[in-house]
């Protein structure tokens, strides 16, 4: 049996300014996004993306993550609490972010970015999908440090007691999610995106991969208390929100392989691909790739 180390959530205290581990984990995730993105761009200098565009992606993405993630947490999990404590809506540094809300926020943000640069939306989402999982994993480490989102009671040897909760051994579900949504998911997306595939396939695989990993991890995670934490049929809110992702991912993969031209890992279509994409490119302008 293990005991949670009860790490101080404040990493650095500079007078009245407190830098929390949770915020540092988000910064680590954004740093991984930039480093991996730069690596992919340098490997494909003739591709659709540049370093300056990557900086814009990060800016748009951060806004999408923070706004969407916070609103998702409020409406999906703790609506009643924030209705009674509206000022705490803005205390994002204390934790309380929803992946599914952040995902919707990023989707909207990338649509705006694609429009700005005259790119196909799926080309943008295919590019960023492999850059995201390590950030998700970093966020789960932040959850573990904060001693939040703990697991369900268990009798496994590695069960962990969270003193802030009770004295019952529980699954360290934050670490499970770090391994699944962070490391395993990153490996899957990085390898898959490096192979020839049609436009939209990487985005579809992202939806399926995250949905499956998250749904599996939810069996070990204590359902969130409050508004819509546990839904019908014994399925948690996280699982209900992941099911549409999996379905949409399957549909997107089938659509991509049936209608889109094969594209190499460097973003170059073959002869058949160029012909198949000519109509799409003509509709969106000569700059769209």
UniProtKB/Swiss-Prot annotation:
Transmembrane regions listed in the UniProt entry: 17-37, 57-77, 89-109, 121-141, 174-194, 200-220, 235-255
InterPro entries in the record: Lgt
Protein family: Belongs to the Lgt family.
EC category name: transferase
Membrane topology according to the record: Multi-pass membrane protein
Pfam families noted in UniProt: LGT
Annotated compartments: Cell inner membrane
Name this polypeptide is given: Phosphatidylglycerol--prolipoprotein diacylglyceryl transferase
Known pathway: Protein modification; lipoprotein biosynthesis (diacylglyceryl transfer)
GO molecular function: phosphatidylglycerol-prolipoprotein diacylglyceryl transferase activity
GO biological process: lipoprotein biosynthetic process
Coarse class of the protein's main subcellular location: membrane
GO cellular component labels: plasma membrane
Keywords: Cell inner membrane, Cell membrane, Membrane, Transferase, Transmembrane, Transmembrane helix
Amino-acid positions noted as binding a 1,2-diacyl-sn-glycero-3-phospho-(1'-sn-glycerol) in the UniProt annotation, renumbered to this chain: 140
EC number: 2.5.1.145
Record's function text: Catalyzes the transfer of the diacylglyceryl group from phosphatidylglycerol to the sulfhydryl group of the N-terminal cysteine of a prolipoprotein, the first step in the formation of mature lipoproteins.
